Each structure stands twice: as C-alpha cells, then as structure tokens.
Amino acid sequence: MLNENVKKVLESSMWDLATCSNGEPNVVPVAFKFVTDDGKLAVGDVFLDTTLKNINANGGKIAISVYNAETLEGYQIKGKAEYLTNGEIVDTFKAMVEKMFSGAATAKGALVITLEKVIVTTPGVDNKREI
C-alpha cells in the first residue's frame, strides 16, 4: 500500500492528522512521526489530547494528509489508530521529544496507524485515485 513515492513524501514532510467525534472535526500537525518497518505510521503523543478522545469515541478512525509543498505531490491516508503507552516505539518518541525540548516535554505514548486506504491528492489525472 505504501509505494516508494508515498513513503518518500511521508518521510520528508509534516503530517496533518484528522479525527472526528460527535460531529466535531479536529486536525493537528505532527512533527514526531515515522513509517514503521511493516508499513504502519507511528505518531508520538505530546499534545494529542483531542485526537485521543476522538479515536476512543470513533473506534480508532483517523485520516492523515501529507504533501510536498514544492511539487504538490500529496496523499490522503485513512486508517485505524491504536494507542500504545510502552514499548520500543514509545521509547523512540520519548527520546526524540526529550532531545528537542531538553526535558521540558515528554511523549506520553504513541499512535500506531494501520493503513486502510491511500488516495492520491496530487493535482492531475491521478487525483482521487486509490493506490
């Protein structure tokens, strides 16, 4: 599902996470993120309070928008999020956040997102095509 183009954009760009519950949408930019070896998306929880409330209320549904601002290559990813409070992924985010904030903030956990759909958002003939 994650071809090399999608993976490259995910690894080089900021992500916007979108969730919704009770008809109230929420979107947040995330900087602490990576693609796992098995093709899932991992996001460090530093300030994801509303996001977590929404995924708990909606069965884990989440969408990610990612794009290259220079080339306009972009993708919308829909999936299901699971929240982790310990383990290797959480430890990785704790180290990242500790380094960036010099101890003033910490990662409380991590979202691990299993992909269900990847949709092209790049302008052109492939726009809206599911990969």
Question: What residues fall within each predicted segment?
Answer:
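Binding-site signature for planar aromatic cofactors or substrates
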Residues: 1-131
